[in-house]
From Swiss-Prot:
The gene is eno. Binds a second Mg(2+) ion via substrate during catalysis. CDD domains: enolase (cd03313). This is Enolase. Pathway: Carbohydrate degradation; glycolysis; pyruvate from D-glyceraldehyde 3-phosphate: step 4/5.
């Protein structure tokens, strides 16, 4: 029996039998939601939900208990309880193979625009767990179940090697400094290149007398004085690893500009800058360093700033909207209409269902915006985003650094997927 026949057979039989949620802990030791969906044929899907530190104000609501006597208010027993009662009852007997129908039930149960009743941390856990259970039922990997025969493009990793901003306790304004292995031919090559640069970066920082402690996402968190010092160190590490800066390994940054914007100016490097002055700083950096991507270059509320930076740099580098779009198809459509950014960061927990996540990806792709699927700073060992990246041909992925197991879990899963695809696998090239 072929795969298609197996899928059709399973779809006519298997139904959702049980939905179970529980409270577990993420990589920062904070509670998060884990969901298991069990089907009538014994198939199981399990998903644990991440949480962000730098959160866009338009994101769907992450519901927490607020009880200061337990986990300093970070508990998630409220969304867990709602999954185990309201959601579980409503999904019992439903087919797991119609993802849009499942997600419409979740949206109807919540009934709010921002998932504030059930919590996006509950709905995304259920939504993804249903998809994983369906894939398990038909006996194929999630990326094949979601993407079919066209799912063969491996994402290029943007690897966070130096942390700053809200992700580290240091002096750096910018949140992430990343290396991008643009010269790689396969994902395995990309992983090797990034690992070798990461090793060398540690040596370089130690010789300079800097700490090699790591931040939330596994990157080093040295007390370098300013952002350009970081770029200098990264270029040095790349070249001392035997690679060429630019043609082998390029640089990317997540500025997270909303975190140092006060509504009128940007408090950057000890100065108050206008949008235009901050853009001029970016232009200078791009002219001096092999930077190919800047994420959240402007605050999500600084729409005129976004228009200006896109006009001035949009034909030179990738300008990624995270807080600007928060994985919301409507906000992406608005960005396209107003020529804001040219790439979209996708975080499934920002929007709250798999269907809406895929809709956001397709909306971006239809309008020739690049797509980068992303982890969060508070992560788990869950590897679902690796499968979505390949299934939807996202092209790029952010999963943190080459330390901390919750970060490497995604990279390791991509190595397995590339092996599974064999010679049909292709590595996306951002240049």
């Amino acid at each position: 029996m072929g795969v298609r026949a197996v899928v059709l057979s399973a779809r006519s039989v298997a139904k959702i039998n049980r939905v179970v949620a529980r409270q577990i802990l993420d990589s920062r030791g904070r509670p998060t939601v884990e969901v298991e969906v069990l089907l009538s044929d014994g198939a199981v899907g399990r998903v644990s939900v991440p949480s962000g530190a730098s959160v866009g104000k338009f994101e769907a609501v992450e519901l927490r208990d607020g009880d200061q006597a337990k986990y300093a208010g970070h508990g998630v027993l409220k969304p867990v309880q709602r999954v185990n009662t309201t959601v579980a009852d409503s999904l019992a007997g439903v087919s797991p193979f119609d993802q849009r129908a499942v997600d419409e039930i979740l949206l109807s149960l919540d009934g709010t625009k921002n998932k504030s009743k059930l919590g996006a941390n509950a709905t995304i856990g259920v939504s993804l767990a249903v998809a994983k259970a369906a894939a398990d039922s038909v006996g194929i990997p999630l990326y094949k179940y979601l993407g079919g025969a066209v799912a063969r493009e491996m994402p290029l990793p943007l690897v966070n090697v130096i942390n700053g901003g809200l992700h580290a306790d240091n002096l750096l304004d910018f949140q992430e400094f990343m290396i991008v292995p643009v010269g790689a031919k396969t994902f395995a090559d990309a992983a090797q290149i990034c690992a070798e640069v990461f090793y060398k970066l540690k040596e370089v920082l130690k010789k300079m007398g800097h700490s090699t402690n790591t931040g939330d996402e596994g990157g080093f968190a040295p007390n370098l004085e300013n952002n350009t010092d970081v770029l200098d160190v990264l270029v040095e590490a790349i070249e001392k690893s035997g690679y060429r800066a630019s043609s082998d390994v390029a640089l990317a940054m997540d500025v997270a500009a909303s975190t140092f914007y006060d509504g009128t100016s940007y408090k950057f490097s000890g100065k108050c800058l206008t949008s235009g002055e901050l853009i001029a700083c970016y232009e200078d950096m791009v002219s001096r360093y092999p930077i190919i991507s800047i994420e959240d270059a402007m605050a999500e509320s600084d729409i005129e700033g976004w228009k200006a930076v896109t006009k001035r740099l949009g034909d030179k580098i990738q300008l990624v909207g995270d807080d600007l779009f928060v994985t919301n198809p409507a906000l992406i459509a608005n960005g396209v209409e107003n020529k804001l950014a040219n790439a979209v960061l996708v975080k499934p927990n920002q929007i709250g269902t798999l269907t809406e996540t895929i809709d956001a990806i397709r909306s971006a792709q239809r309008n020739n915006y690049n797509v980068i699927i992303s982890h969060r700073s508070g992560e788990t060992e869950d590897v679902t985003i690796a499968h979505i990246a390949v299934a939807a041909n996202c092209g790029q992925i952010k999963s943190g650094s080459f330390s901390r197991s919750e970060r490497l879990a995604k990279y390791n899963e991509l190595l397995r997927i590339e092996e599974d695809l064999g010679k049909s696998a292709l590595l996306y090239n951002v240049i």
